[in-house]
Amino acid sequence: MAAPEVQYLSSGDTALTVQFGTVIERELNSRIVALGHSIAKAAIPGVSETLPTYRSLLVNYDPLVLSRDQLVARLQPLVDSPPDADDAAPARWQVPVCFDSELAPDLAHVAGASGMSEAQVIKAMLDVTHHVYMLGFAPGQPYICLLYTSDAA
């Protein structure tokens, strides 16, 4: 992955968006998540939280503690340096799922549309590790990457 162009965009008076290009890629998102961890470890006074998205990181800060320019100056070295292995390592979660027809009403539709049996769809869903790009919009709603490289499911 080539180094993306980084832009610092004001998001109101208390947030800064660190935007990495225009494409959505798993490797890029992993870098963004790692940057959020690096910022937390740096404990920059005035920074209250970071929120990763597909291709950017929102940094919330207190402008009474540090200015936008001061924040960019503190972030730039973190953006420019490769993430620590600990920061880049993804968290792993095992999530229980239920494919009961009452709780998964679209299972039959997905099976029919993909030409797979319901059992094959379930197996396909469970045989992959899902990468969560971000949580958001609906609280706690995971946004996961493309699951399949074929037209199945």
What are the functions of these language-model segments?
Residues 89-99:
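Internal glycine-rich flexible loops
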Residues 97-147:
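Anionic-ligand-binding alpha/beta catalytic cores of soluble enzymes and soluble regulatory domains
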Residues 148-153:
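Conserved small/polar residues in nucleotide/adenosyl-binding loops
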